[in-house]
Amino acid sequence: RQMCIRDRKISFSIIALLALLIFVLYPGNDITCLDIVPPATANVQSAQAGDVLKMDIPHSEHKLTLIFIPKGSYPITKSGHRTEITYPYWLGKYEITQEEWEKMMGWIPIPELEDRWTITTGARYPMCQVSYDECLDFCDRLTEIARQQGILPEGYCFSLPTEAQWELAYSCGKEIVLPDNLEKVAWMDFHDANTGAYPVGQKEPNAWGFHDMLGNVWELCADFYHSHRLHGRNPVNWKTDTGNLSTDTGLSVTSLGGRVFSFIPDNEKEIPRERYHADSRRASTGLRVALVPVQQHQLLKKRLKHLHPVPDWLMDIRYSFELIYMYMKTYWKTLTNL
């Protein structure tokens, strides 16, 4: 009988160890490339680069304006790689304004400063102080209203753009570097601690017609944060690892285009990107929406659904095993090269 109990304990220990190793080494339903074939509907096939789609905002004289972007690519400056988007989409001409948010959602967050920015309020000022999940809820609401108005392209819905989609619109197919006419397209007074955001569309647009891609508020992207820019075909980072998922901050996502570029050294020409905690609400961070294939938004929602909270002690164990695994992998590689 004692032998039977001991065998059961050993079996249970082995199963528990295997389960822990799977938890540590298997990343789950991670996605790094969007393999999407959007429906070839008439309104997509007939659209041309730069075509404008306008959506009525309930109880507002202003319209939400989006610009059509056909499939394209752009070079990654430092690495020499290229990033390619193989399907068309629409991106907001402006950052989402406070009026657009309030009319669609019925509320505006109470300004509670978490950083040194001053919150500037007004109908045409960019929306800020919103979390990642709240931005996705806003996109779902836009999709619902656009469908009711009969203007939603078949097979498409509103979502946050991926980092690559944002950068293609910013770069206009060229290198993702700061423009020579920076003062004409972006606000340059970030050094003033009392300065908040400005009304959208006050600066010149880029070559494809987008305003405030630099220099107003940071703009949230759909990607989970990664330390470097991705490249390749339809890249996206929906992989949870120790770089973007931690016990004290939760999920971290990417934001682009903020005014921190005024501190960038002269020899650093790439546009700024920042790590943003998904649950945070900052006066310096807002959003710009995109119309993307439904599959893209569904994949994001499905990925987020699988991000269940993990106890701190279990994450500590996971990190320990990851370190051991990385050490053993390096050690084995060294031995095989001898």
Listing of model-derived features with the role each one plays in the protein:
Residues 1-5:
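Short, small-residue-biased leader/transition segments that mark boundaries at the very start
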Residues 6-14:
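N-terminal Sec-pathway targeting helices
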Residues 13-24:
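Hydrophobic membrane-insertion alpha-helices, especially the h-region
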Residues 28-44:
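Ser/Thr/Pro/Gly-rich low-complexity linker/stalk segments immediately outside membranes or between
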Residues 65-73:
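Mature N-terminal segment immediately following signal peptide/propeptide cleavage
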Residues 81, 194-196, 213-316:
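Surface-exposed recognition segments
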Residues 83-183, 222-233, 291-303, 309-314, ...:
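Active-site microenvironments of metalloenzymes and redox enzymes
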Residues 184-214:
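Short, well-ordered junction/capping motifs at the entry into regular secondary structure
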